Amino acid sequence: MPPRELSEAEPPPLPASTPPPRRRSAPPELGIKCVLVGDGAVGKSSLIVSYTCNGYPSRYRPTALDTFSVQVLVDGAPVRIELWDTAGQEDFDRLRSLCYPDTDVFLACFSVVQPSSFQNITEKWLPEIRTHNPQAPVLLVGTQADLRDDVNVLIQLDQGGREGPVPEPQAQGLAEKIRACCYLECSALTQKNLKEVFDSAILSAIEHKARLEKKLNAKGVRTLSRCRWKKFFCFV
């Protein structure tokens, strides 16, 4: 019997290649500019540092102009908030006003244990804001709330012949008078209500931008209490 001829086995047919799944393009990042104003030494820098970097400045250093950037998620969409820390001293009035245009939201800050800083909200800060930016929302923020019941602070106020801490109802009344979005008290040291301040600022800015772009639907923006909220980066 003649030997059988061996033939090379044909390779099995390759399975049809399937294209890799397409990655969903990331939603565009929304940018928000938030400017903090108020008298010197009321704790504006401390608010920003405590919120963005989870730290607390060990000593007071007057600010000329600093910016911080944080990325967060709101309803799954990336939002980058730029926090502008301004100087409260008169020497920086001209420099400070340069950052007011294109601001999406202002935090008008006063210390609850410095009545003069509260008085300056209506005498200086609100007029200055509205001169350069008449439409952006304003939040009234009472800082250093942890000192409201501090015995040493109360003694110093009494010995100096100054008024006591600013009553919360009085601050609430001012917020209504100046048509601020809300009034919030917070502490950079203990971080009490700190997140709520910036949550409210971001929400107010988003709604303001939506109104300007005429894209705010009937339901509006969901409250941040229902949103997934994550902080990613801090750039100083």
Swiss-Prot record:
Cite the record's note on assembly. Answer: Interacts with PAK2.
- What tissue expression does the UniProt record report for this protein? Highly expressed in brain and testis and at lower levels in spleen and lung.
Subcellular localization, as worded in the UniProt entry: Cell membrane; Endosome membrane
Which GO cellular component terms are attached?
A: endosome membrane; plasma membrane
* Cofactor annotation: Mg(2+)
Function in brief: Plays a role in the control of the actin cytoskeleton via activation of the JNK pathway.
Gene name, Swiss-Prot/TrEMBL: Rhov
Q: Where is the composition biased (Pro residues)?
A: 10-20
Variant or mutagenesis effect after changing R226Q: Loss of subcellular location to plasma membrane
Q: Where is the lipid attached (S-palmitoyl cysteine)?
A: C234
Q: Where is this region: Disordered?
A: 1-28
* Membrane topology, as annotated: Lipid-anchor
Similarity comment text for this entry: Belongs to the small GTPase superfamily. Rho family.
Organism classification, top ranks?
Eukaryota, Metazoa, Chordata, Craniata, Vertebrata
Its GO biological process annotations read: actin filament organization; endocytosis; establishment of cell polarity; signal transduction; small GTPase-mediated signal transduction
Q: Which residues bind GTP?
A: 38-45, 85-89, 143-146
Which GO molecular-function terms appear in the entry? GTP binding; GTPase activity; metal ion binding; protein kinase binding
| UniProt keyword terms in alphabetical order | Cell membrane, Endosome, GTP-binding, Lipoprotein, Magnesium, Membrane, Metal-binding, Nucleotide-binding, Palmitate, Phosphoprotein
Instruction: Output this protein's name.
Output: Rho-related GTP-binding protein RhoV
| InterPro entries in the record | P-loop_NTPase (IPR027417), Small_GTP-bd (IPR005225), Small_GTPase (IPR001806), Small_GTPase_Rho (IPR003578)
